């Protein structure tokens, strides 16, 4: 028969067998009282705790995936954006340097020919405006013709039965007549606009031809400079469009990131509100901060304020230590002050004297490093009661 040896804690372990490790930061769970009839275990397995309900909520995993995807996209697109901006600045500096070098070689002919190229630019813009005005005028004419056809159809419907006036056809006729009037006004406005921009385009082209005759020699000498300038301008416009597109992608990814984060906060608030709505907190259940919360559960604010108000001016005496098996009575817990515990934790690096409170309080907070001593467990520095 295996020899039994006494170990600390009152348990007897046969010689040659290993004692299972005891994780000290886990709060012992109180045994669940079985209901009459032996159905207690089945009901406890069927009913999930709020913590398990949080972990099993599929919305959290889905929103976390959205959050991670948006974060990865933001990082990738921002890298591309930085590279595109660097390329744009490099091309801009290189073009300015080459244009300055070309201008120093050509001399004053560039300034003499500049009015001609400026007039060409204005003439090109006027030509584009003329094309846009022509498209608007054609659209207005099409709408006017369609409205007139609608009026014709409505008149035929009204005159179909001379003995009776159909209110539906009458309403359609009135509506079509209004459309004809609006389309007529739009057509006249488009026609006037087209005539105006056409005159401007003709004036710009006439000025270009006049300057070309006057500055023929300077234009010929400065042609390489302005051709190089037009080439660099086109390249810079392309890179500028790329930078603008990447900026829009970054803004959209950040918007998706914010939406996912907001959804996580809403889910956390819903879960926490559901937990606050429960009648009591089970003794063996650890209370954790909701997803996305800074520190400490919101549901314990009322309890914390009640303890602080009830224990104002009182606290635990220094040097009092609760053993592993000792549990504080109700009077001691009612006089426990959160401020006293916090100051005590700042003075010492061990919370050995708080182990007995695990059955009555919920410890939660950031983990501290390994405890000084022979045990390898971890303890919590900040607690919430």
Swiss-Prot record:
TM annotation in the entry = none
Domain of life, source organism: Eukaryota
Renumbered residue ranges of the record's region Disordered: 1-58, 272-328, 359-385
Annotated protein name in UniProt: SH3 domain-binding protein 5-like
Q: Basic and acidic residues: which segments have biased composition?
A: 18-28
From the Swiss-Prot or TrEMBL record, what is one GO molecular function term? guanyl-nucleotide exchange factor activity
Role according to the record: Functions as a guanine nucleotide exchange factor (GEF) for RAB11A.
Instruction: Provide the family line.
Output: Belongs to the SH3BP5 family.
Tell me which GO cellular component terms the UniProt record holds: cytoplasm
Q: Where is the composition biased (Low complexity)?
A: 318-328
